[in-house]
Amino acid sequence: MLYKNYTDLINKLVWIIPKKSKRDNMRNILNDIVNTAYKVEYIINNNNSINEKDYIIINQCDGFAGQLGKYIFGEFIKDNYNKNVKYDISWYSISGLDIEKKEKRKFDLLNCFEDINIEIASNEETEIYKRLFYYDSGDFYNLCRNKKRLYCHFHPHIGSFDKSYIMKKLDIHKNLYHKLKDNNLNLYNEIINHPASVAVHIRRGDIKAHGGFGVFKNNDSIYKDYVFKAVYLMIEKLKPMKPKFFFFSNDMNWVKNNIFKHLNKEVDYIYCDNDNKDAVYFDMYLMSSAKHMIFTIGAFSQLAYMFNKNKNIIVISPDNINSL
Protein backbone atom coordinates (compact mmCIF):
# COMPACT_ATOMS: atom_id res chain seq x y z
CA MET A 1 0.00 0.00 0.00
CA LEU A 2 1.20 3.48 -0.81
CA TYR A 3 0.24 5.14 2.46
CA LYS A 4 1.07 3.80 5.94
CA ASN A 5 -1.66 5.48 8.00
CA TYR A 6 -4.90 5.43 6.04
CA THR A 7 -7.01 6.00 9.15
CA ASP A 8 -5.40 9.38 9.71
CA LEU A 9 -5.63 10.24 6.01
CA ILE A 10 -9.33 9.33 5.83
CA ASN A 11 -10.13 11.41 8.91
CA LYS A 12 -8.42 14.40 7.34
CA LEU A 13 -10.27 13.94 4.05
CA VAL A 14 -13.76 13.63 5.53
CA TRP A 15 -13.29 16.54 7.92
CA ILE A 16 -14.27 18.95 5.14
CA ILE A 17 -17.80 17.49 5.13
CA PRO A 18 -19.84 19.70 7.49
CA LYS A 19 -22.64 17.30 8.43
CA LYS A 20 -21.60 14.58 10.88
CA SER A 21 -23.87 11.83 9.53
CA LYS A 22 -22.61 12.32 5.97
CA ARG A 23 -19.06 12.60 7.24
CA ASP A 24 -19.41 9.26 9.05
CA ASN A 25 -20.95 7.62 5.99
CA MET A 26 -18.09 8.78 3.78
CA ARG A 27 -15.56 7.59 6.37
CA ASN A 28 -17.15 4.12 6.33
CA ILE A 29 -17.13 4.02 2.52
CA LEU A 30 -13.47 5.02 2.32
CA ASN A 31 -12.56 2.51 5.02
CA ASP A 32 -14.32 -0.24 3.06
CA ILE A 33 -12.35 0.72 -0.05
CA VAL A 34 -9.05 0.67 1.83
CA ASN A 35 -9.91 -2.65 3.50
CA THR A 36 -10.68 -4.17 0.11
CA ALA A 37 -7.38 -2.90 -1.27
CA TYR A 38 -5.55 -4.43 1.69
CA LYS A 39 -7.28 -7.76 1.12
CA VAL A 40 -6.34 -7.83 -2.54
CA GLU A 41 -2.72 -6.95 -1.79
CA TYR A 42 -2.57 -9.48 1.02
CA ILE A 43 -3.93 -12.31 -1.14
CA ILE A 44 -1.42 -11.53 -3.88
CA ASN A 45 1.53 -11.35 -1.48
CA ASN A 46 0.42 -14.41 0.46
CA ASN A 47 0.18 -16.50 -2.69
CA ASN A 48 3.70 -15.40 -3.61
CA SER A 49 5.10 -16.35 -0.18
CA ILE A 50 6.41 -19.87 0.34
CA ASN A 51 7.32 -19.95 4.02
CA GLU A 52 5.09 -17.28 5.52
CA LYS A 53 4.03 -18.10 9.07
CA ASP A 54 0.51 -17.61 10.36
CA TYR A 55 0.26 -15.80 13.67
CA ILE A 56 -2.01 -14.01 16.09
CA ILE A 57 -1.47 -10.38 17.02
CA ILE A 58 -2.66 -9.30 20.47
CA ASN A 59 -3.30 -5.60 21.01
CA GLN A 60 -1.50 -4.28 24.10
CA CYS A 61 -3.29 -1.10 25.26
CA ASP A 62 -3.51 -1.30 29.05
CA GLY A 63 -1.82 -0.59 32.32
CA PHE A 64 0.63 -3.06 33.80
CA ALA A 65 -1.96 -5.59 35.00
CA GLY A 66 -3.61 -5.64 31.58
CA GLN A 67 -0.24 -6.14 29.91
CA LEU A 68 0.44 -9.19 32.06
CA GLY A 69 -3.03 -10.58 31.40
CA LYS A 70 -2.54 -10.37 27.65
CA TYR A 71 0.94 -11.85 27.87
CA ILE A 72 -0.42 -14.85 29.79
CA PHE A 73 -3.22 -15.19 27.22
CA GLY A 74 -0.61 -15.21 24.45
CA GLU A 75 1.44 -17.86 26.24
CA PHE A 76 -1.68 -19.97 26.74
CA ILE A 77 -2.46 -19.74 23.03
CA LYS A 78 1.08 -20.79 22.11
CA ASP A 79 1.05 -23.70 24.54
CA ASN A 80 -2.42 -25.03 23.72
CA TYR A 81 -3.10 -24.10 20.09
CA ASN A 82 0.39 -24.24 18.58
CA LYS A 83 0.15 -20.67 17.29
CA ASN A 84 2.75 -17.97 16.79
CA VAL A 85 1.93 -14.84 18.80
CA LYS A 86 3.01 -11.23 18.35
CA TYR A 87 2.03 -8.07 20.23
CA ASP A 88 0.97 -4.68 18.94
CA ILE A 89 2.38 -2.05 21.32
CA SER A 90 1.80 0.99 19.07
CA TRP A 91 -0.87 2.39 21.44
CA TYR A 92 1.81 3.39 23.96
CA SER A 93 3.48 5.74 21.48
CA ILE A 94 0.24 7.00 19.88
CA SER A 95 -1.78 7.64 23.06
CA GLY A 96 -0.90 5.61 26.14
CA LEU A 97 -3.38 7.46 28.37
CA ASP A 98 -5.97 6.09 30.77
CA ILE A 99 -9.71 6.42 30.16
CA GLU A 100 -9.75 9.96 31.54
CA LYS A 101 -6.70 10.95 29.43
CA LYS A 102 -4.70 11.86 32.54
CA GLU A 103 -2.36 9.05 33.60
CA LYS A 104 0.31 7.95 31.14
CA ARG A 105 0.65 4.19 30.68
CA LYS A 106 4.01 2.62 29.86
CA PHE A 107 4.74 -0.74 28.30
CA ASP A 108 6.55 -2.08 31.35
CA LEU A 109 6.28 -5.80 30.74
CA LEU A 110 9.88 -6.21 29.58
CA ASN A 111 11.19 -3.79 32.22
CA CYS A 112 9.75 -5.98 34.95
CA PHE A 113 10.34 -9.42 33.45
CA GLU A 114 13.68 -9.20 31.70
CA ASP A 115 13.87 -12.97 31.22
CA ILE A 116 10.88 -13.29 28.86
CA ASN A 117 10.93 -13.05 25.09
CA ILE A 118 8.05 -11.55 23.16
CA GLU A 119 7.70 -10.73 19.48
CA ILE A 120 6.59 -7.19 18.65
CA ALA A 121 4.51 -6.81 15.49
CA SER A 122 5.80 -4.33 12.94
CA ASN A 123 3.69 -1.33 11.93
CA GLU A 124 2.98 -2.97 8.58
CA GLU A 125 1.91 -6.25 10.17
CA THR A 126 -0.30 -4.40 12.63
CA GLU A 127 -2.01 -2.35 9.92
CA ILE A 128 -2.71 -5.38 7.73
CA TYR A 129 -3.97 -7.61 10.54
CA LYS A 130 -6.07 -4.88 12.10
CA ARG A 131 -7.90 -4.28 8.83
CA LEU A 132 -8.25 -7.90 7.72
CA PHE A 133 -8.47 -10.07 10.83
CA TYR A 134 -9.79 -7.77 13.59
CA TYR A 135 -11.87 -9.29 16.41
CA ASP A 136 -12.98 -7.52 19.57
CA SER A 137 -15.65 -9.95 20.76
CA GLY A 138 -16.61 -13.60 20.67
CA ASP A 139 -15.05 -16.79 21.98
CA PHE A 140 -11.37 -16.03 21.45
CA TYR A 141 -10.27 -19.56 22.28
CA ASN A 142 -12.62 -20.92 19.64
CA LEU A 143 -11.36 -18.31 17.19
CA CYS A 144 -7.77 -19.31 17.91
CA ARG A 145 -8.71 -22.92 17.32
CA ASN A 146 -10.37 -22.28 13.96
CA LYS A 147 -8.65 -19.23 12.48
CA LYS A 148 -5.14 -19.04 11.08
CA ARG A 149 -4.75 -15.31 11.60
CA LEU A 150 -6.27 -12.99 14.19
CA TYR A 151 -5.91 -9.47 15.52
CA CYS A 152 -7.26 -9.71 19.08
CA HIS A 153 -8.48 -6.53 20.76
CA PHE A 154 -9.94 -7.53 24.11
CA HIS A 155 -9.20 -7.60 27.85
CA PRO A 156 -8.77 -11.13 29.27
CA HIS A 157 -9.71 -11.59 32.92
CA ILE A 158 -6.60 -12.59 34.84
CA GLY A 159 -8.71 -14.67 37.22
CA SER A 160 -9.59 -17.03 34.36
CA PHE A 161 -6.03 -18.38 34.36
CA ASP A 162 -4.71 -20.91 36.83
CA LYS A 163 -2.47 -19.39 39.50
CA SER A 164 0.16 -22.11 39.10
CA TYR A 165 0.30 -21.48 35.34
CA ILE A 166 1.03 -17.78 35.87
CA MET A 167 3.73 -18.49 38.46
CA LYS A 168 5.28 -21.05 36.10
CA LYS A 169 5.46 -18.49 33.30
CA LEU A 170 6.55 -15.48 35.34
CA ASP A 171 8.95 -15.36 38.30
CA ILE A 172 8.41 -11.92 39.81
CA HIS A 173 10.76 -12.54 42.75
CA LYS A 174 13.70 -13.52 40.53
CA ASN A 175 13.20 -10.45 38.36
CA LEU A 176 12.57 -7.79 41.00
CA TYR A 177 14.11 -8.69 44.35
CA HIS A 178 17.64 -7.70 43.30
CA LYS A 179 16.29 -4.32 42.09
CA LEU A 180 14.80 -3.32 45.44
CA LYS A 181 16.55 -0.49 47.23
CA ASP A 182 15.99 2.17 49.90
CA ASN A 183 12.33 2.49 50.89
CA ASN A 184 11.16 -0.41 48.73
CA LEU A 185 13.71 -2.78 50.24
CA ASN A 186 12.82 -1.70 53.78
CA LEU A 187 9.13 -2.22 53.05
CA TYR A 188 9.75 -5.64 51.56
CA ASN A 189 11.67 -6.78 54.64
CA GLU A 190 8.98 -5.43 56.95
CA ILE A 191 6.22 -7.12 54.95
CA ILE A 192 7.81 -10.57 54.82
CA ASN A 193 8.99 -10.51 58.43
CA HIS A 194 5.65 -9.45 59.95
CA PRO A 195 3.58 -12.54 60.90
CA ALA A 196 0.30 -10.84 59.88
CA SER A 197 1.14 -8.37 57.12
CA VAL A 198 -1.87 -7.26 55.04
CA ALA A 199 -1.61 -5.53 51.67
CA VAL A 200 -4.47 -3.12 50.93
CA HIS A 201 -4.83 -1.85 47.37
CA ILE A 202 -7.02 1.22 46.82
CA ARG A 203 -7.62 1.95 43.15
CA ARG A 204 -8.15 5.59 42.27
CA GLY A 205 -7.20 7.48 39.09
CA ASP A 206 -9.79 6.69 36.42
CA ILE A 207 -11.96 4.85 38.94
CA LYS A 208 -15.14 6.76 37.99
CA ALA A 209 -14.82 5.44 34.43
CA HIS A 210 -13.95 1.91 35.59
CA GLY A 211 -16.76 -0.59 35.17
CA GLY A 212 -15.81 -2.32 38.41
CA PHE A 213 -16.74 0.77 40.43
CA GLY A 214 -20.36 -0.21 39.86
CA VAL A 215 -20.07 -2.66 42.74
CA PHE A 216 -19.90 0.44 44.96
CA LYS A 217 -22.74 2.11 43.03
CA ASN A 218 -20.18 4.65 41.76
CA ASN A 219 -20.29 6.23 45.21
CA ASP A 220 -17.13 7.23 47.08
CA SER A 221 -18.88 6.99 50.46
CA ILE A 222 -19.80 3.34 49.85
CA TYR A 223 -16.26 2.75 48.61
CA LYS A 224 -14.77 4.18 51.81
CA ASP A 225 -17.18 2.22 54.02
CA TYR A 226 -16.05 -0.97 52.30
CA VAL A 227 -12.39 -0.22 53.06
CA PHE A 228 -13.13 0.38 56.76
CA LYS A 229 -15.29 -2.74 56.98
CA ALA A 230 -12.59 -4.84 55.28
CA VAL A 231 -9.85 -3.58 57.61
CA TYR A 232 -11.83 -4.28 60.79
CA LEU A 233 -12.98 -7.67 59.47
CA MET A 234 -9.37 -8.63 58.77
CA ILE A 235 -8.43 -7.66 62.33
CA GLU A 236 -11.14 -10.02 63.64
CA LYS A 237 -10.08 -12.82 61.31
CA LEU A 238 -6.44 -12.66 62.39
CA LYS A 239 -6.94 -12.56 66.16
CA PRO A 240 -5.03 -13.08 68.42
CA MET A 241 -2.36 -11.79 66.04
CA LYS A 242 -2.32 -8.06 65.45
CA PRO A 243 -2.03 -7.32 61.73
CA LYS A 244 -0.14 -4.50 60.13
CA PHE A 245 -1.75 -2.96 57.05
CA PHE A 246 0.36 -1.85 54.10
CA PHE A 247 -1.59 0.56 51.88
CA PHE A 248 -0.92 0.87 48.15
CA SER A 249 -2.66 3.34 45.86
CA ASN A 250 -2.22 5.45 42.74
CA ASP A 251 -3.60 8.41 44.71
CA MET A 252 -2.16 8.28 48.22
CA ASN A 253 -3.33 11.81 49.03
CA TRP A 254 -6.93 10.62 48.66
CA VAL A 255 -6.19 7.68 50.95
CA LYS A 256 -4.60 9.94 53.57
CA ASN A 257 -7.54 12.35 53.59
CA ASN A 258 -10.37 9.82 53.33
CA ILE A 259 -9.11 6.66 55.02
CA PHE A 260 -6.22 7.26 57.41
CA LYS A 261 -7.89 10.19 59.17
CA HIS A 262 -10.85 7.99 60.12
CA LEU A 263 -9.19 4.71 61.12
CA ASN A 264 -9.36 3.69 64.78
CA LYS A 265 -6.17 4.43 66.68
CA GLU A 266 -5.46 0.74 67.33
CA VAL A 267 -5.07 0.05 63.61
CA ASP A 268 -1.39 -0.42 62.77
CA TYR A 269 -0.71 0.74 59.23
CA ILE A 270 1.84 2.24 56.90
CA TYR A 271 1.50 3.59 53.38
CA CYS A 272 3.87 2.54 50.64
CA ASP A 273 5.58 5.42 48.90
CA ASN A 274 7.22 3.77 45.90
CA ASP A 275 10.80 4.94 45.27
CA ASN A 276 10.12 4.80 41.55
CA LYS A 277 6.64 6.19 40.87
CA ASP A 278 6.72 5.15 37.22
CA ALA A 279 7.58 1.51 37.96
CA VAL A 280 4.23 0.31 39.30
CA TYR A 281 5.35 -3.31 39.15
CA PHE A 282 7.30 -2.76 42.39
CA ASP A 283 3.98 -2.10 44.14
CA MET A 284 2.62 -5.35 42.71
CA TYR A 285 5.68 -7.25 43.93
CA LEU A 286 5.46 -5.78 47.44
CA MET A 287 1.73 -6.50 47.63
CA SER A 288 2.29 -10.10 46.55
CA SER A 289 4.74 -10.55 49.44
CA ALA A 290 2.15 -9.86 52.16
CA LYS A 291 0.60 -12.69 54.18
CA HIS A 292 -2.96 -11.49 53.47
CA MET A 293 -4.69 -9.07 51.09
CA ILE A 294 -7.62 -6.67 50.75
CA PHE A 295 -8.86 -5.92 47.21
CA THR A 296 -10.95 -2.99 46.04
CA ILE A 297 -11.48 -3.01 42.26
CA GLY A 298 -9.43 -3.61 39.14
CA ALA A 299 -7.01 -6.32 38.05
CA PHE A 300 -3.91 -4.94 39.79
CA SER A 301 -4.58 -6.44 43.22
CA GLN A 302 -5.92 -9.66 41.70
CA LEU A 303 -2.70 -10.08 39.77
CA ALA A 304 -0.63 -9.45 42.90
CA TYR A 305 -2.61 -12.28 44.51
CA MET A 306 -1.60 -14.57 41.64
CA PHE A 307 2.04 -14.16 42.70
CA ASN A 308 1.32 -14.65 46.42
CA LYS A 309 2.77 -17.91 47.78
CA ASN A 310 1.05 -17.98 51.19
CA LYS A 311 -1.09 -21.13 51.26
CA ASN A 312 -3.13 -19.80 54.20
CA ILE A 313 -3.81 -16.36 52.74
CA ILE A 314 -7.01 -14.54 53.70
CA VAL A 315 -8.35 -12.38 50.88
CA ILE A 316 -11.15 -9.87 51.39
CA SER A 317 -12.81 -8.46 48.29
CA PRO A 318 -16.12 -6.80 47.36
CA ASP A 319 -17.27 -10.23 46.17
CA ASN A 320 -16.77 -12.09 49.44
CA ILE A 321 -16.84 -9.54 52.27
CA ASN A 322 -20.42 -10.33 53.25
CA SER A 323 -19.87 -14.09 53.31
CA LEU A 324 -16.68 -14.31 55.39
What are these regions (language model features)?
Residues K39, I50, D54, I94-K242:
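Secretory-pathway luminal glycosyltransferase catalytic domains
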Residues M1-T36:
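Boundary detector for helix-to-coil junctions that initiate low-complexity/charged tails
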Residues Y38-S90:
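N-terminal pre-catalytic "stem/leader" segment of glycosyltransferase-like enzymes
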